[in-house]
Amino acid sequence: MKKLFPIIILFTSCASVTINPSILSPSNVEIPKKLHRLNIGLAQSRITTLEAVSSIIKQDEMFTIWERELEANIFDSGDEPMGYIDYKVIFNEVVPTEKGKRYFLITNLTFWIPSMVGYPIIEVEKIIEVEITIFNKKMKKINKYNIISKSEPGKLGLYNLYAVEANDMIATVAVTKDIIQIFKSRLESDVESINKQLEASFLSN
């Protein structure tokens, strides 16, 4: 039996998790009155350059979803941007839940023996906080939205640790989509005023 555990660990750790690219697709929920088209991001705020290959520019999943959602469901059909919209990530961490802290304590007090038969090592949740700021053409701030959301708790055990990276991506996508829906609901009551301010700045150039 003792020889069996390393074999199980080896095979489970070699397993892979397949993620369907469709999870990055925008929702099919448009806001009733659209926001005037804006430049997405300020300078390099929405892209990161890979260190290994400096010529490649990578957008991670949260900014991919954000850009697609803006284009599909938030911006109007105007050709020329009337300002800027910035999506700044303030906090993005996986943290243990209170139950997860108890799991971890029990696991360590029992020398990880229960985890060998499927007892969770820890339970965690993904928490993301963002600031979404809208600026006019002259870079004057019009409105700012601070939004926090978190994922459903997820348990980690000895035999699913291989899936941590994939699960983190799935949680990031879910939380980002929730943040965007919260933003859309708040924007609905402000969009008329924001559009008027964008128009005034744009026409005064």
Give the residues covered by each predicted segment:
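A mature extracytoplasmic/lumenal domain signature
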Residues: 44, 91-93, 136, 147-151
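Short acidic/His/Gly/Ser-rich catalytic and metal-binding motifs that mark active-site loops
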Residues: 49-50, 98-100, 153-158
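Glycine- and small hydrophobic-rich membrane-insertion segments that are intrinsically disordered
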Residues: 48, 53-61, 106-119, 160-166
